[in-house]
């Protein structure tokens, strides 16, 4: 027989409560645990990518910024007017023409600089005589004491006295000592200067149909070229005859 007052709840033993689902607190904790892990992984990936970029492009930040600016400027220009191939050919032709013109100008400048003042103040065959003198003089200086050359010089004897040259050099208070080569060079320079000035004065005398070289001829020769302006205190300037 059964007891009518029997309650099914009384006959059943204690039942354990089954978790219906994850509690909110546990979900928050798991998310908090996963976030640092994900963040560390992302940070590591970014560092690896940065190291890879640095190994591929070993440039500084300033250079990288300049490259970006140049790319932006190039992207903003309109390239439709002239194709790159045509532009390259035109630039090549222009560069070739300019190089050729520059080469010709350089050669002309060199020739002009060498004999720029040689014929200054002279005309006709007088100018040709002076240019020929300087050409022969340059060739002689370059070939002196060379093997097989006819121009040999021991630099021990000159037309001008070395003692007089040393005395003139010592008039400068800043000159304390004079080497053995200095008077030789000064003597050669003085010899060239006197020879050229004599030739210029002779051109003046011959033009005036005279055979005697006078002081007026030297003064007139000095006035015809600005190379001799340093002698203005020695030889006063006079009006040139018409």
Swiss-Prot record:
Main localization of the protein described in the UniProt heading: nucleus
Gene Ontology MF, one: DNA-binding transcription activator activity, RNA polymerase II-specific
Keywords (A to Z) from UniProt: Activator, DNA-binding, Nucleus, Phosphoprotein, Transcription, Transcription regulation
An example Gene Ontology CC term for this record: nucleus
Chain intervals for the UniProt region annotation (Disordered): 1-108
Family matches, as CDD domains: HFD_NFYC-like (cd22908)
GO biological process per UniProt: positive regulation of transcription by RNA polymerase II; regulation of carbohydrate metabolic process; regulation of cellular respiration; regulation of DNA-templated transcription; regulation of transcription by RNA polymerase II
Phosphoserine PTM sites in chain numbering: 7
Ranges of compositional bias, category Acidic residues: 91-108
Localization, UniProt: Nucleus
Polar residues bias locations: 1-15
Misc note: Present with 450 molecules/cell in log phase SD medium.
Similarity remark: Belongs to the NFYC/HAP5 subunit family.
Binding partners and assembly: Component of the CCAT-binding factor (CBF or HAP complex II), which consists of one copy each of HAP2, HAP3, HAP4 and HAP5. The assembly of the HAP2-HAP3-HAP5 heteromer (HAP complex I) occurs in a one-step pathway and its binding to DNA is a prerequisite for the association of HAP4.
Function: Acts a component of the CCAT-binding factor, which is a transcriptional activator and binds to the upstream activation site (UAS2) of the CYC1 gene and other genes involved in mitochondrial electron transport and activates their expression. Recognizes the sequence 5'-CCAAT-3'. HAP5 is essential for DNA-binding activity. It may be the linchpin that binds to the subunit association domains (SAD) of HAP2 and HAP3 to bring these proteins together.
Record-given protein name: Transcriptional activator HAP5
Gene source species: Saccharomyces cerevisiae (strain ATCC 204508 / S288c)
Organism phylogeny: Eukaryota, Fungi, Dikarya, Ascomycota, Saccharomycotina
Gene: HAP5
